[in-house]
Regions:
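Core catalytic machinery and nucleic-acid-binding channels of phosphodiester-processing enzymes
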Residues: 68, 115-126, 167, 207-209, ...
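RNase H-like nuclease fold core
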Residues: 124-202, 209-214, 241
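Edge strands and adjacent loops of beta-rich recognition modules
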Residues: 2-5
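Short Cys/His-rich Zn2+-coordinating modules
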Residues: 11-23, 48-62
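Conserved beta-strand -> loop -> alpha-helix junction used to position metal-binding or nucleic-acid-contacting
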Residues: 206, 216-249
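Short, positively charged, Gly/Tyr-enriched micro-motifs
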Residues: 38-41, 51-158, 198
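Secondary-structure boundary/capping micro-motif
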Residues: 12-15, 103, 107, 114-116, ...
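Residues immediately within or flanking Cys/His clusters that coordinate Zn2+
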Residues: 29-32, 70
Length: 249
């Protein structure tokens, strides 16, 4: 994470605020590559003081501080360099962001914010960045068997439909709504990531007419299988209805 010419020049523990402060600096006379065109050995123009939240040191919050250089490139002019321990314009180190991304699949972002003592708005920024980056690199060329189900995203009737690669147990697409157009949007996204709608052989879903219609219209070679949970749910509801009718009789 920390590479030459960067080095730790001082560490201070703030007893009052119970946090560790780490100060970084570059070696005098250092030159840096241009962040835009890559030209090597650009001279330092000036510096900007910046700080980043880092992984905790034991139970104590840790912050890193550095004079980040602006270089003068003969091609691009004055540019702020990229530091090796953080993304551009991020207030967190890469290791702290990695920790957030490790927690995100298993708990709400609000709970993460409480755990790390950061506002959830700040946490959503790196989450959105890394999810977008991962989505752009996603390859769905081998997706053949898909499961789809809807879930309520908020109180009320705001639904999200989630599509899962059943062979890899991996979510490949999520979209608002639960009508037949959700399958159409899945098909479009599948194509954008190297997938083939005609290569989908199986779809597992509930008995929603909307999902059935969407599959028939957009995944022509897919065989629909109703998932066990919804089949048993419908069966139990029918048994309960018969029982009520018998009790009335």
């Amino acid at each position: 994470m920390l590479t030459p010419p960067w080095q730790v020049v001082e560490c201070q523990f703030d007893v009052k605020h119970e946090c560790l402060n780490i100060y970084l600096d570059f070696l005098r006379g250092s030159h840096f590559p241009c962040p835009d065109c890559g030209q090597e050995d650009c001279a330092v123009h000036d510096t900007e003081n910046k700080s980043w939240r880092h992984l905790n040191f034991f139970q104590h919050e840790t912050f890193m501080y550095a004079r980040v250089t602006r270089i003068k490139c003969s091609n691009c002019g004055v540019r702020l360099i990229n530091v090796p321990w953080a993304r551009a314009d991020s207030g967190f180190t890469l290791l702290f962001e990695a920790y957030i991304m490790m927690l995100a699949p298993s708990m709400p972002v609000q709970r993460i914010s409480e755990l790390v003592s950061e506002h959830d708005t700040r946490l959503w920024r790196p989450i959105h960045h890394h999810v977008k980056e991962a989505r752009e690199q996603a390859d769905h060329s081998d997706v053949k068997k898909v499961g789809v189900d809807e879930t309520s995203s908020k109180r009320g009737h705001n639904y999200v439909s989630i599509f899962v690669d059943l062979e890899k147990s991996k979510t490949v697409f999520a979209t608002e709504g639960k009508d037949n157009t959700t399958v159409e949007r899945f098909k479009d996204d599948l194509c954008k990531h190297g997938g083939d709608p005609e290569a989908i052989t199986d779809v597992s879903c509930d008995m929603s007419p909307a999902f059935i219609k969407g599959v028939e219209e957009n995944l022509p070679n897919a065989e629909i299988t109703f998932d066990k949970f919804h089949v048993l749910k419908t069966l139990n509801e029918a048994v309960d209805e018969v029982r009520r009718q018998e009790q009335k009789g």
